[in-house]
């Protein structure tokens, strides 16, 4: 694994140039090289895992190479049991801690009072509000003090993600987002998992290529896009939880969150 001898300082003033340079550098590296390079730039690096097959590949690389990258997950309170069980299995397998960030019960109660516990089925606004409470607020806490946010986004996951770069500046959170697997397709992912014997969510074998909260995820049909089972009752262009959508952090839908 050959890592370029490059020192970079990422700052908001030169964000576009810094990010473009970093994107070009990462394009020439393999997965372990990309993660090692980012870990060596200085500043806290955080990887958010949903325990999906892509994220398991990144977690395996972090654990195998003992990289100084914090691994965190958003335990929304509505995950599949298989996903929750995989957290412990993954920690044990790779000797790492996956730190869990959970929503506040007061926020959940306020959401339920406004929309109903399962109100996300009734409107896009209600679904976005649920994701805001269960994902976006915990994500903000997970990324506090981070300079780099590593994700498992891939270009092949959906049309919305077809232009995913290796590095992009997140102005709302004032950090650099690193999409370390942007150019991997699902066949590369599966081959790597098989070669390295990486534990994966058993739901993948039951027709769930993309796994989120249990009430909002279904198995897909043959020929459907990988993320077709996420919020399947909505139009494709709206099928994002807000974690990777510009503007979602600062301008959420009508809030169900109480003022404190």
Swiss-Prot record:
Catalytic reaction list: [thioredoxin]-disulfide + sulfite + AMP + 2 H(+) = adenosine 5'-phosphosulfate + [thioredoxin]-dithiol
Keywords assigned: Cytoplasm, Iron, Iron-sulfur, Metal-binding, Oxidoreductase
GO cellular component: cytoplasm
Pfam families xref list: PAPS_reduct
EC number: 1.8.4.10
Keyword Iron-sulfur (UniProt): yes
Cofactor: [4Fe-4S] cluster
Similarity comment text for this entry: Belongs to the PAPS reductase family. CysH subfamily.
Name of the protein in question: Adenosine 5'-phosphosulfate reductase
Annotated gene: cysH
């Amino acid at each position: 694994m050959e890592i370029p001898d490059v020192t970079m300082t990422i700052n908001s003033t030169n964000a576009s140039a810094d990010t473009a340079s970093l994107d070009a550098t990462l394009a020439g590296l393999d997965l372990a090289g990309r993660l090692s390079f980012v870990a060596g730039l200085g500043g806290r690096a955080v990887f958010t895992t949903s325990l999906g097959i892509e994220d398991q590949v990144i977690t395996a690389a972090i654990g195998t190479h003992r990289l100084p990258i914090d691994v965190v997950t958003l335990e929304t309170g509505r995950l599949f049991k298989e996903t929750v069980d995989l957290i412990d299995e993954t920690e044990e397998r790779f000797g790492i801690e996956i730190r869990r960030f959970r929503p506040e019960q007061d926020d959940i109660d306020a959401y339920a009072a406004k929309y109903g516990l399962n109100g996300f089925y009734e409107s896009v606004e209600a679904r976005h509000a649920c994701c805001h409470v269960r994902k976006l607020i915990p994500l903000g806490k997970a990324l506090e003090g981070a300079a780099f946010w590593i994700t498992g986004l891939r270009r092949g996951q959906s049309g919305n993600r077809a232009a995913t770069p290796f590095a992009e500046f997140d102005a709302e959170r004032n950090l650099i987002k690193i999409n370390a697997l942007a150019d991997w397709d699902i066949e590369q992912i599966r081959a790597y998992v098989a070669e390295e014997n990486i534990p994966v969510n058993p739901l993948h074998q039951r027709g769930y290529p993309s796994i989120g909260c249990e009430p909002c995820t279904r198995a897909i049909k043959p020929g459907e896009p990988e993320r077709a089972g996420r919020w399947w009752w909505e139009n494709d262009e709206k099928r994002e939880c807000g974690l990777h959508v510009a503007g979602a952090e600062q301008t959420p839908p009508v809030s169900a969150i109480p003022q404190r």
